[in-house]
Amino acid sequence: MTVELPEGYRPSADEPFMNDMQKEFFRRKLVAWREELLHESAETLDNLKQGGMTVPDIFDRASAEADKALELRTRDRMRKVISKIDAALDRIEDGSYGYCEETGEPVGLERLIARPIATMTIEAQERHERMEKTYNDE
């Protein structure tokens, strides 16, 4: 089903939560973000391939290795975000997008606009992070 969005459309609290227009808005936002990350990832891969030259100076080599490690961490982070974007797109398809995976409550439009891969309300996310911190400190 294709939904036409008016130019400049932005989801509003005045309309039913996760109506077809809102779902299409977030679907487009997620797809565009995914494409941007894939493009950046391809550039990162090109940079890594070009960085395969032997550097004679030990300091230059250390710097090149540090750059390569940073590129690899960035690429890994992008891969994780792309995975979360794919999961969000799946939730749009199955109708669970925009609802907290812990409480079932709406995550909130402003939160989704700021972080379209959010899966929890702010309150549930804070509880989750407190629990994580408690168990990770042991």
Report each predicted region and the residues it spans.
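Residues immediately within or flanking Cys/His clusters that coordinate Zn2+
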Residues: 97, 118
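Interaction interfaces in information-processing and related assembly proteins
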Residues: 1-94, 131-132, 137-138
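Short Cys/His-rich "knuckle" micro-motifs
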Residues: 110-114
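Short cysteine-rich clusters marking metal-coordination/redox-active sites
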Residues: 100-103, 121
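Membrane-interface alpha-helices
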Residues: 121, 126-131
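Short functional micro-motifs and their immediate structural scaffolds
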Residues: 107-108, 129
